[in-house]
């Protein structure tokens, strides 16, 4: 194919019309921020996933990359790796605090500079520092996660985005270099109970503070270890950012036991707007990239697929927090 992505005829027509219209209405959009999950926002064209790699040369991997994310994980393709160590979380024994944002694309929690939260272990050879917690969700139950397991989606997906602090000084630099990023994904179902960490983020007093784009609310005294199941396995593969520039420098770690939130909490998420209050309401839901080909990439897991009936037992299937296995 060469170095450039080839447009289909419909894509070329849409892009030509959109760029022509943009030339006649107001200032040009910021090329580093001109993207969306939906092509049509209030009658204006904004590049959706099929166009990400076509409108900005720096995003070309979105169109031509061979290690893109998200993917559909077929469990029969997962290779059992008994040498994968448990995941380790370091918080320095302190509670997490930070700011919950409605970015117009995601519900995003940005931790404060202190305490520093690090993850290591599993497939990671380096310590990675937490930079963002991102929540993706759908307009209907069972169709909100980016990744799928055996062709089945989940209602939401929580992504913990980390950068390699041993090799890079920040997330931006790490996203451009090898072994730069690690993203832990936890899947979410709608049920009668709720994960205790997500309950802090999604209770009525909190979630109504970020109803519109650019709204923010400060939270503190959060115990990040409560986000994780008491015991779990994980699947890992090499992939990319699932947003522009789609850099192929991510080690993905998918936790194989889903979390729960209530139907009321999910409804509250769907009432969040991707626009400011001065503009028409458009739900934040449906904020995920479509599946990408897995191709010949390896999927590794720490559970033996030959014995799927066996429960995760022992310290290798627990999150190790500040030096020891976490239990509730």
Swiss-Prot record:
Its main location: secreted. GO terms for cellular component: basolateral plasma membrane; extracellular region. Glycans are attached at residue 118. Residues 1-23 form the signal peptide. Keywords: Glycoprotein, Secreted, Signal. GO terms for molecular function: zinc ion binding. Residues 33-303 form the Alpha-carbonic anhydrase domain. InterPro entries: Alpha_CARP_X/XI (IPR041878), CA_dom (IPR001148), CA_dom_sf (IPR036398), Carbonic_anhydrase_a-class (IPR023561). It is found in: Secreted. Residues 300-328 are annotated as: Disordered. It comes from the Eukaryota. Gene3D superfamilies: Alpha carbonic anhydrase. Residues 319-328 have a biased composition (Basic and acidic residues). Belongs to the alpha-carbonic anhydrase family. Does not have a catalytic activity. PANTHER family: CARBONIC ANHYDRASE (PTHR18952), CARBONIC ANHYDRASE-RELATED PROTEIN 11 (PTHR18952:SF93). This is Carbonic anhydrase-related protein 11. It comes from Mus musculus.
